[in-house]
Amino acid sequence: MDPKTSVVPPALHLVDPQIQLTIIRMEDAVVHGQSNAVPKVYPIILRLGSQLSLSMARRNLDSLEARAFQSTPIVVKMTKLATTEELPDEFVVVTAK
């Protein structure tokens, strides 16, 4: 049996190491300035043949909820194709068309 097919359940997408997403937390960009923000790079897990679109969603920075949200440390590790509903609003997310 092929080792790859034995460890990757059909429900999971295959990881393409050549496709990566650079994420800059809005908190870092606001506090340190955009030029000083350190982007984090995550692998994107795709279904073969998927087309990608990049979108940015963010909270209203004038609201108290947004300020509290920004001050909360967030750690995200992408393990599947993400949608805006599955990641915090301050992150750039990738969706399949």
Swiss-Prot record:
<comment type="subunit">
    <text>Homodimer.</text>
</comment>
<dbReference type="InterPro" id="IPR037223">
    <property type="entry name" value="Protein_9b_SARS"/>
</dbReference>
<dbReference type="InterPro" id="IPR018542">
    <property type="entry name" value="Protein_9b_Betacoronavirus"/>
</dbReference>
<dbReference type="GO" id="GO:0044162">
    <property type="term" value="C:host cell cytoplasmic vesicle membrane"/>
</dbReference>
<dbReference type="GO" id="GO:0016020">
    <property type="term" value="C:membrane"/>
</dbReference>
<keyword id="KW-1043">Host membrane</keyword>
<protein>
    <recommendedName>
        <fullName>Protein 9b</fullName>
    </recommendedName>
</protein>
<keyword id="KW-1036">Host cytoplasmic vesicle</keyword>
<feature type="domain" description="9b">
    <location>
        <begin position="8"/>
        <end position="97"/>
    </location>
</feature>
<dbReference type="Pfam" id="PF09399">
    <property type="entry name" value="bCoV_lipid_BD"/>
</dbReference>
<keyword id="KW-1035">Host cytoplasm</keyword>
<keyword id="KW-0472">Membrane</keyword>
